[in-house]
Regions:
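P-loop/Walker A NTP-binding module and the surrounding RecA-like catalytic core of P-loop NTPases
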Residues: 92-95, 100-313
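Non-catalytic terminal/linker segments enriched in charged/polar, low-complexity residues
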Residues: 1-100, 106-113, 130, 134-139, ...
Length: 313
C-alpha cells in the first residue's frame, strides 16, 4: 500500500498543529511583505532575521535568501508581495526527500531507532511497526532500551496494538543479547523489518557509542544481508536543542533519517528546515498526535503548504 494515500485529515491536523509556528514565522513574513514598497538590502536583512528567529537556522536561511535574490533578479521582480511564492518554493527546495529515502520498506531491513528519553522514541517505534504492518509487512520489534524500566512495558503495549512480535529483555539486560535474539527471531519468522528500540543516553556518549557499536557488530555478523537504516527521534518543541541532539547523535551513529515528533502545538516547527540543511540528513517522518495515523512520511510540499496554509484538502 503506497502511503501517498494519506488518511484524510492529516493535512488539516498539520495545518492546525503548525498554528504556533505559523504565528511565529508567517505573520512576520506577511507584515514584512506588506510593510516594504520595494525590495532592497533592508528587506532581505529583515527577512533573514524573521527566518532565523523562526528556528530555520543560519545555514538554511542564508541558502533561502541567496536563492530568493537570484530568482528576483532573474525574473525582474520589483514588488515584495510578488516574492512570497518564490520564498515558499525556496523553503520547499531545502527539504526535498528522495524517493529512495524509504528503501528500507521494500527490502529485508533493520531499522535502529535512537533518541533521548522523553522525545517519543518508543512511541515512534510502535507507530512505525503499525504503519509497516498496515502495508502488509511482517515486523519484529527488539526492545533493546533495557535501561528504562517503563520502556519494555510501553513497547509491549505498542507491539500488541500493532499486532507484531516483540523480543525484549529484563530491565538492565544486555541490549546486544536482545538484538541477537531478535535477529534470530526475524530470520525464523522471515520478517521483512526488524525495528530496534535503543537506549538514548546521550549524557554518556562513550557508553552509547560502545552499545551501538556492539549492536552494529552483531547485525553485521548475524544479519549481513539486511538493509540498514538509523533514525534519530527528536522533539520539535525543543527547537535548536533538537539540532544539538541530532549533531551529537551523528557523532556516534551514521544517521540516515530524522523523525520529528510533537509538531502539533510547537512554535518551533521551523527546526524541520534547519535540521535538514545543517546535517544534510532528511526528515523522513513527522508526528502531530498520539495515534498511529498521526505519524506520517514527511512531504516538503505538504509541510510548507500547511505552514503557510496555502491550500486545503
Amino acid at each position: 500500500m503506497e502511503e501517498k494515500e494519506k488518511k484524510p485529515g492529516f493535512f488539516k491536523r498539520l495545518v492546525s498543529g503548525l498554528t504556533k509556528t505559523r504565528d511565529n514565522i508567517v505573520s512576520g513574513i506577511d507584515s514584512l511583505f506588506s510593510g516594504f514598497s520595494h525590495i532592497d538590502d533592508d528587506f532581505y536583512e529583515e527577512l533573514e532575521e524573521i527566518l532565523i528567529m523562526g528556528d530555520l537556522g543560519v545555514r538554511a536561511t542564508e541558502s533561502i535568501i541567496e536563492d530568493l535574490q537570484r530568482k528576483v533578479k532573474e525574473q525582474h521582480i520589483k514588488e515584495p508581495a510578488e516574492c512570497k511564492e518564490l520564498l515558499i518554493e525556496s523553503i520547499k527546495e531545502q527539504m526535498k526527500v528522495e524517493e529512495t529515502a524509504y528503501r528500507f520498506e521494500n527490502e529485508k531491513s533493520v531499522v535502529l531507532v535512537i533518541g533521548v528519553n522523553g522525545v517519543g522514541k518508543t512511541t515512534t517505534v510502535g507507530k512505525l511497526a503499525g504503519k509497516l504492518k498496515e502495508q502488509g509487512k511482517k515486523v519484529v520489534i527488539a526492545g533493546a532500551d533495557t535501561f528504562r524500566a517503563a520502556a519494555g512495558d510501553q513497547l509491549k503495549e505498542w507491539a500488541n496494538r500493532a499486532g507484531v512480535d516483540m523480543i525484549g529483555g529484563a530491565e538492565g539486560a544486555d541490549p546486544g543479547a536482545v538484538v541477537y535474539d531478535a535477529v534470530a527471531a526475524s530470520k525464523a519468522r522471515n520478517a521483512d523489518v526488524l525495528l530496534v528500540d535503543t537506549a538514548g543516553r546521550l549524557h554518556n556518549k562513550e557508553n552509547l557509542m560502545n552499545e551501538l557499536g556492539k549492536i552494529n557488530k552483531i547485525l553485521e555478523s548475524e544479519y549481513p544481508d539486511a538493509y540498514r537504516e538509523t533514525l534519530v527521534v527528536l522533539d520539535a518543541t525543543t527547537g535548536q536543542n533538537a539540532l544539538v541532539q541530532a549533531r551529537e547523535f551523528s557523532d556516534v551513529a551514521k544517521i540516515s533519517g530524522i523523525v520529528l515528533t510533537k509538531m502539533d502545538g510547537t512554535a518551533k516547527g521551523g527546526i524541520a528546515v534547519a535540521i535538514q540543511s545543517e546535517l544534510s540528513v532528511p526528515v523522513k517522518y513527522i508526528g502531530v498526535g498520539e495515534t498511529i495515523d498521526d505519524l506520517q512520511k514527511f512531504d516538503s510540499d505538504e509541510f510548507v503548504n500547511a505552514l503557510f496554509d496555502t491550500k486545503t484538502e
